[in-house]
Amino acid sequence: MDRNINFSPVFIEPRFKHEFLLSPQRYFYILVFEVIVALIILNFFFKEEILYTFFPLAKPSKNSINSLLDRTMLKCEEDGSLMISRPSGIYSALSLDGSPVRISDCSLLLSSINGASSSTSPYSIFNRR
């Protein structure tokens, strides 16, 4: 086992002898192949964006909950209790434990929400621009 082993590299020259590359329109076929690959990649990554460009999403219709919330207002009483005013009546705002919410500077709180002095919609802070 004391023999020396010499490895000589063997190189195989790659030859592409496909019919579509040897025809006179070989560049056309390569171009078609590249366009198909590009369209597949675009479809994979940007399918939703392309669809939304041509077919935009329909705006959701207003439901009864949103129309009720649009007509809901917060008001302050003289004793500092926070009241909810709806078309069906005026109700006391309740804490999680069921007790009425009383804030010493109730009108200051409402004016800090969106600049209203006596009443404001509790959902108007989400509609600011």
Curated annotation (Swiss-Prot):
Q: How is it modified after translation?
A: Most cysteines are linked by disulfide bonds. They are created by the viral disulfide bond formation pathway, a poxvirus-specific redox pathway that operates on the cytoplasmic side of the MV membranes.
GO terms classed as biological process? fusion of virus membrane with host plasma membrane; symbiont entry into host cell
Stated induction or repression of this protein's expression? Expressed in the late phase of the viral replicative cycle.
- Major localisation: virion
Q: Where in the cell is it found?
A: Virion membrane
Q: What InterPro entries does the database record attribute to this sequence?
A: Poxvirus_L5
Membrane-protein topology: Single-pass type III membrane protein
What domain of life is recorded for the organism? Viruses
| Gene Ontology CC entries for this record | membrane; viral envelope; virion membrane
Q: Does the keyword Transmembrane helix apply?
A: yes
Which keywords does this Swiss-Prot/TrEMBL entry list? Answer: Disulfide bond, Fusion of virus membrane with host cell membrane, Fusion of virus membrane with host membrane, Late protein, Membrane, Signal-anchor, Transmembrane, Transmembrane helix, Viral envelope protein, Viral penetration into host cytoplasm, Virion, Virus entry into host cell
- Cystine bridges: C76-C106
- Where are its TM segments located? 27-47
Task: Please explain the role this protein plays, according to its UniProt record.
Answer: Envelope protein part of the entry-fusion complex responsible for the virus membrane fusion with host cell membrane during virus entry. Also plays a role in cell-cell fusion (syncytium formation).
* Subunit comment: Part of a stable entry-fusion complex (EFC) which is at least composed of proteins A16, A21, A28, G3, G9, H2, J5, and L5. Formation of the viral membrane is necessary for the assembly of the complex. Interacts with G3.
Protein family per UniProt: Belongs to the chordopoxvirinae L5 family.
Protein name per its UniProtKB record? L5 homolog
